[in-house]
């Protein structure tokens, strides 16, 4: 979790794929640590950058696709979920970190069924 925490600004905000909002590294880690140690302990993520838009020399916005491949530790067993992430990145001490992140699960708007994008 130390490497995960290092990605974020101290006062970062995070909205997970279920709409749960937290603020600050401690709350972000508190939200993620239990699932990383249990249901996602044998899962992997594949990320694909869509775009980066510079707002200033020290602030940019990025969008990227993320595919979670859950393993046997997940109660539903092995399966995949695609999400679209939006981040606001800030440069701090010549290094980029996440100031804000929002994660949205791809679903069918009529049924709520989780859908996978075509790769």
For the regions a language model picked out, list residue spans one by one.
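Short, surface-exposed coil-to-beta transition loops
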Residues: 45-47, 63, 79-85
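A short, structured loop/turn motif at beta-sheet edges
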Residues: 52-61, 89-97
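Extended, polar beta-sheet/loop recognition surfaces of beta-rich domains
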Residues: 118-119
């Amino acid at each position: 979790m130390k490497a995960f925490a290092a990605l974020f600004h101290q006062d970062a905000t995070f909205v997970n794929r279920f709409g749960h909002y937290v603020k600050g590294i401690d709350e972000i880690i508190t939200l993620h640590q239990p699932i990383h140690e249990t249901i996602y302990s044998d899962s992997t993520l594949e990320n694909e950058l869509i775009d980066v838009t510079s707002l200033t020399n020290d602030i940019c916005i990025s969008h990227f696709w993320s595919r979670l491949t859950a393993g046997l530790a997940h109660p539903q067993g092995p399966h995949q979920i695609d999400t679209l992430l939006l981040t606001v990145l800030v440069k701090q001490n010549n290094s980029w970190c996440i100031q804000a992140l929002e994660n949205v699960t791809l679903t069918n708007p009529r049924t709520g069924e989780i859908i996978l994008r075509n790769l």
